[in-house]
Amino acid sequence: MSKLWGGRFTEEAEAWVEEFGASISFDQQLVNQDINGSIAHVTMLAKQGIVTKEEAEKIKIGLQYLLEEAKQNKLHFSVEAEDIHLNIEKMLIEKIGEVGGKLHTGRSRNDQVATDMHLYLKEKVEHIIKATKQLQTVLVHQAENNIETIMPGYTHLQRAQPISFAHHILAYFWMLERDVNRYEDSLKRINISPLGAGALAGTTFPIDREYSAELLGFNGMYENSLDAVSDRDFILEFLSNSSMLMMHLSRFCEELILWSSQEFQFIEMSDQYATGSSIMPQKKNPDMAELIRGKTGRVYGNLFSLLTVMKGLPLAYNKDLQEDKEGMFDTVKTVEGCLHIMAGMLETMTVNKEKMGQAVTQDFSNATEIADYLANKGLPFRQAHEIVGKLVLHCTQKGIYLVDVPLATYKEMSSLFEEDLYEVLSPYAAVKRRNSAGGTGFEQIEKALEKAKGLTKEVIKN
């Protein structure tokens, strides 16, 4: 077929060269955005008198037809037409005649593709925000059911201090809230229009960029035409935000994987989110959590790939920028899928409250309570720390825990110890007392839950 840009050329490219340079295999995902952008563009052209109202109406009817065909997956794309833009233009001309060729007046594929991607990411980021909020509601529900579920808190993966399981869950709620905030802030930069920037220098036609931006729901437009067609910051920001979100999901999945093991037994995954072994009949593997953890590296890779593409590009458009789309599409699909799986996995998991409770009665995570006990009686904390360290050593040598140590032995270490010491050794009491703002104390968790519910109330309504 003859190329829409073929006037300059006397030889046709080899078939394998065409295939190598074509992007239609993946940028066809922008079909809705491309057609909607074209409808806005031709509407603006008619308003400005650049095309007649009759021509614009004919073009819009043709575009609406193609849009309906696209929604029903009836469009057939060709590698020969290279990309989504030329495929749609070719189909339009075939449908309505040569007047379809006027659609591209005052526009380049450079500003066209940038517009498509802005529209695409605007829609997808809003979907991801909603999915993240839905995951947050699951976390809130689990936290509500586990306020007084006591578990070991860890540092260095060693038992550190007893905490409420709800407190641990809500830590991830607030991580996700920051992710939501980043996505929401990024919409300020996504929701601006490059349409009308042309190839790089604007156009000689009397276009109205503000009008076309308004038609497409953009809040503004790029101030510089070179920047408009060269910018991929908005995609990089999306990939960066998605990498952080996936990092948070991955960290949680790592803990879920550990907790579901025989060594912990803190939780059990629903059969819906676990798999078995082809050789070992007893196995119940946390495959979904492992996949989310694994797919995090995939999203990181998409970010680093585009950063590497962009680092050496002069202004304005270069064919390298064709490589900006597959990683973006892949990240959208990956993040949406992981959020959906994560929500279902957390909603259906069984929390083994008894096992968690046993864990904090058979360790030394209450050691800090004794140090605080002595400090509250006036002993410098560093001295209290030393005394309790010796008590822990004594216990490990005897094969006992702090609650088993007789008062007489405590008094040998410090005369400040009294019978009330044993009250502070209770893991439940230890958690309850940590009532500083943002702490694991039950009152603080109730306050945190109220805030969390306020941030997810719109999702809960829907």
From Swiss-Prot:
Its main location: cytoplasm. It is an enzyme of class 4 (lyase). This is Argininosuccinate lyase. Keywords: Amino-acid biosynthesis, Arginine biosynthesis, Cytoplasm, Lyase. One of its GO terms (biological process) is arginine biosynthetic process via ornithine. It is found in: Cytoplasm. It comes from Bacillus cereus (strain ATCC 10987 / NRS 248). The gene is argH. InterPro entries: Arg_succ_lyase_C, Argininosuccinate_lyase, Fumarase/histidase_N, Fumarate_lyase_CS, Fumarate_lyase_fam, Fumarate_lyase_N, L-Aspartase-like.
